[in-house]
Curated annotation (Swiss-Prot):
This is Peptide chain release factor 1. One of its GO terms (molecular function) is translation release factor activity, codon specific. It comes from Mycoplasma mycoides subsp. mycoides SC (strain CCUG 32753 / NCTC 10114 / PG1). One of its GO terms (cellular component) is cytoplasm. The lineage of its organism: Bacteria, Bacillati, Mycoplasmatota, Mollicutes, Mycoplasmataceae. The keyword Protein biosynthesis applies. It is found in: Cytoplasm. The gene is prfA.
Length: 364
């Protein structure tokens, strides 16, 4: 392990000890924001510091074993020292690799729940139908992960599917797996309404955003205009007779969110505020990305809605992810929620890129 890395790990270990001490401070316990920040930092440090402590112990065992081999005459003790030396050399090599991977930059949002928005884009009715197919695909994938999914807002398409659907997925490390789904999903297939059997290309866009808490995204009440109105149901069914639907406008950004599917006006306001925090976060991220150097563009994609990320070719039962060049000839299985192969490939590509960037920095 190089000296810079070792020094950084020593600093992390000291920082963790300081955080543990601070978390016992009464003033910090009263400050929810500070308490939350420290707990988050503690969680980020604990695992790597634990591995570093293991690494240092293994290094000490190597020193002890070498000392025995240099000074001991007893053959039995020498044999035991050789075994210990081999075991701890392997351990040090393994721990060094694990620690270096842990030290790669992490996405602070990876542990978060997500809000997903799917829109039917180019292709009219067929795009809306495909948006519905994507929603079903994500629902099925969520089931395999034991995640919970909840529709927040939906505009049903005239021929089926959705012109727009917004839903939340809650569970373990949802954003870390679904963040790469953001972008334009292109479908090539023969629409059911196409009498001549011609293949049509349509597009649905997906935006995957981390759920943001009130602590992370602070929105002032005087920056909001809140309107209430009567909720409308499909075909006039189950329409509320009270003004339970909520529309919130964020005046500084002009962002508008609505919710009408909650059980009460209070529920709808909570849902709308959750969506608003996420939308404000998205606007801030887009602003930062626009200001960033274009040459530093992420290899696995920008996450922009307009970026074509995947093509679903129904006649050939083929799906291609254009960011990693992965093609699977089992579209039928993918649409049943079997998207892990794409997710794993994209995570690996992100990891590979981070390692390359870190090596570049080390050589500077």
């Amino acid at each position: 392990m190089n000296a810079k890395t070792y020094e950084a790990l020593e600093t992390m270990q000291k920082r963790l000890l300081q955080i543990l001490k601070d978390l016992e401070d009464e003033n910090i316990l009263k400050d929810i924001k500070k308490f939350t920040e420290l707990n988050k930092e503690k969680s980020n440090l604990e695992e790597v510091v634990e591995k570093f402590v293991e690494y240092k112990k293994a290094v000490e065992h190597i020193k002890d074993a070498k000392a025995i081999l240099e000074n001991e005459k007893d053959q039995e003790l020498i044999e035991l020292a050789k075994i210990e030396l081999d075991e701890n050399n392997d351990k040090v090599e393994h721990l060094q690799q694990v620690i270096e991977e842990m030290l790669l930059p992490k996405d602070p949002n990876d542990d978060k729940n997500v809000i997903v928005e799917i829109r039917g884009a180019a292709g009219g009715d067929e795009a809306n139908i495909f948006a519905g197919d994507l929603l079903r695909m994500y629902k099925l994938y969520a089931e395999t992960q034991n995640w919970k999914i909840n529709i927040l807002e939906a505009s049903v398409g005239e021929a089926g599917g959705y012109s727009q659907v917004v839903f939340m997925i809650k569970g373990d490390r949802v954003y870390s797996k679904l963040k790469f789904e953001s972008g334009a999903h292109r479908v090539q297939r023969v629409p059911k309404t196409e009498a001549k059997g011609r293949i049509q290309t349509s597009t649905a866009t997906v935006a995957v955003l981390p759920e943001m808490s009130e602590v992370e995204i602070e929105i002032r009440s005087n920056d909001l205009r809140i309107d209430t109105y009567r909720a409308s149901g499909a075909g006039g069914q189950h329409v509320n007779t009270t003004d339970s639907a909520v529309r919130i406008t964020h005046l500084p950004t002009g962002i508008v969110v609505t919710s009408q599917d909650g059980r009460s006006q209070h529920d709808n306001k909570d849902i709308a505020m959750t969506m608003l925090r996420t939308k404000v976060y998205e606007a801030e991220v887009e602003k930062q990305q626009a200001q960033a150097d274009a040459t530093r563009k992420n290899a696995v994609g920008t996450g922009a809605r307009s970026e074509k990320i995947r093509t679903y070719n129904y006649p050939q039962n083929r799906v291609t992810d254009h960011r990693v060049g992965l093609t699977l000839n089992k579209l039928d299985q993918v649409m049943e929620g079997n998207i892990d192969e794409f997710i794993i490939a994209l995570i690996n590509e992100e990891q590979r890129q981070k390692v390359a960037e870190q090596l570049e920095k080390n050589n500077e």
